[in-house]
Amino acid sequence: MNYIGAHVSSSGGLEKAVFRAFQIKATTFSFFTKNQRQWISLPLQKKNIEDFKKACIKYNFSPEKILPHSSYLINLGHPIDFFLEKSRVAFIDEIVRCDQLGLRFLNFHPGSHLNKISEVTCLSRISESINIALEKTKNVVAVIENTAGQGTNIGYRFEHLYEIIKKIDDKSRIGVCIDTCHLFASGYDLRTKIDYESTFNKFFDLIEMKYLKGFHLNDSKKQFNSRVDRHENLGLGEIGKSVFKWIIKNKNFHNIPMILETINPKLWEKEIDWLRSLQ
């Protein structure tokens, strides 16, 4: 079975995210567990947690198939110690929130070197940050998202993801989420069956299947290898629709949450219906 959904708003309460996912006929979803534009948020109250869990039961969402996203403020490879520590504290808080909500995963962007340290040093800082967070928390798997390589963001090569994972102490709590727009923008082609197979062969040459915990299914507004992160609705961008058919039909990817972050939410239900029809 494919679990297909979108990144929905949690405005008005976390339980509202569950209902919004239900409205678009999703079987999974992504959301922010706190205001992603703020470093510090009030702790989750008992009622917040209970309302969210009740909504998941009511609308038939399995907590281990939900893929929440961390704040974009967090930079686990920050070159300045003050901001690195701030990011680490915020990351730990987000993992704790996921655990309180009964969720298994936390998806996050690895970080950026800001042209102040080398990529190698940045990757080491990211691994160290994850190790610190995992040591201070429990249960939740930290899921690294590949990036488009825009600006000074790290994580745009499979080798980057491999190097991060290699240094993680508790490998049962680390995973990867593949964003198709980011793949395409960072130089991994997906437009033909040969290119799609070549890209995923390169991925699995470095990273075992067991680490793949999620997909972000997005077309790209920008051209191949642009290193620019601009999502587009499926089939309306530079990638085209074919790759999404191949991903959905790949039995190795069944039971993995697949999240739309396409730019027009009004099309999400239609996109979910189309993806589901391919199963």
From Swiss-Prot:
It comes from Buchnera aphidicola subsp. Schizaphis graminum (strain Sg). NCBIfam families: nfo, PRK01060.1-4. Binds 3 Zn(2+) ions. It holds the Pfam family AP_endonuc_2. GO terms for biological process: base-excision repair. Zn(2+) 1 binds at H69, H109, E145. This is Probable endonuclease 4. The keyword Nucleotide-binding does not apply. PANTHER family: APURINIC-APYRIMIDINIC ENDONUCLEASE, ENDONUCLEASE IV ENDODEOXYRIBONUCLEASE IV. Belongs to the AP endonuclease 2 family. The gene is nfo.
